[in-house]
Each structure stands twice: as structure tokens, then as C-alpha cells.
Amino acid sequence: NSGNPCCDPVTCQPRRGEHCVSGKCCRNCKFLRAGTVCKRAVGDDMDDYCTGISSDCPRNPYKD
């Protein structure tokens, strides 16, 4: 993905000094801060939050 500024064009891994290439918890090649909402609640659901150590948006563990 040579069009992604976070991605090394040869390996498509994060460039040196960058944390991530893509994901709901990745912005400007860095992980979003822990506690940042990455998925808003719908209905009786609860918000999902970034962990600060991953680009993934984990499911809230307190959901039923």
C-alpha cells in the first residue's frame, strides 16, 4: 500500500518510529490514546474504547 504514509512501501509494515498502518485506533501512524471512543454505543450497547497499545478497537468486556 504505497499510498499510505505510515506504511513502508517494500514491507507494508509500519515505518520506523510509527506504531500502526491502519485501524480504528490508529491516526497519523500512532495509536490513539487509551480511553478514546472507537465505536459509539447503539441502543442498549456500550461504547468501545481504544487501549492505547493497539490499532484494533476491542469489544467492551462489560457488554452482555
UniProtKB/Swiss-Prot annotation:
Compartmental location: Secreted
Tissue specificity: Expressed by the venom gland.
Single GO cellular component term: extracellular region
Ranges of residues in domain Disintegrin: 1-64
Record keyword Plastid present: no
Short sequence motif named Cell attachment site, residue ranges: 42-44
Signal peptide segment: none
Entry-linked InterPro entries: Disintegrin_CS, Disintegrin_dom, Disintegrin_dom_sf
GO MF, any single term: toxin activity
Domain of life of the source: Eukaryota
Keyword tags: Cell adhesion impairing toxin, Disulfide bond, Hemostasis impairing toxin, Platelet aggregation inhibiting toxin, Secreted, Toxin
Positions of disulphide bridges: C6-C29, C20-C26, C25-C50, C38-C57
Family: Belongs to the venom metalloproteinase (M12B) family. P-II subfamily. P-IIe sub-subfamily.
Role noted for this protein: Poor inhibitor of platelet aggregation. The disintegrin inhibits the adhesion of the alpha-4/beta-1 (ITGA4/ITGB1) integrin to VCAM-1. Inhibition on alpha-IIb/beta-3 (ITGA2B/ITGB3) is low.
Further information: Negative results: does not inhibit alpha-1/beta-1 (ITGA1/ITGB1), alpha-2/beta-1 (ITGA2/ITGB1) and alpha-6/beta-1 (ITGA6/ITGB1). The disintegrin belongs to the dimeric disintegrin subfamily.
Subunit structure and binding partners: Heterodimer with VLO5B; disulfide-linked.
Name used for this protein in its record: Disintegrin VLO5A
Protein's organism: Macrovipera lebetina obtusa
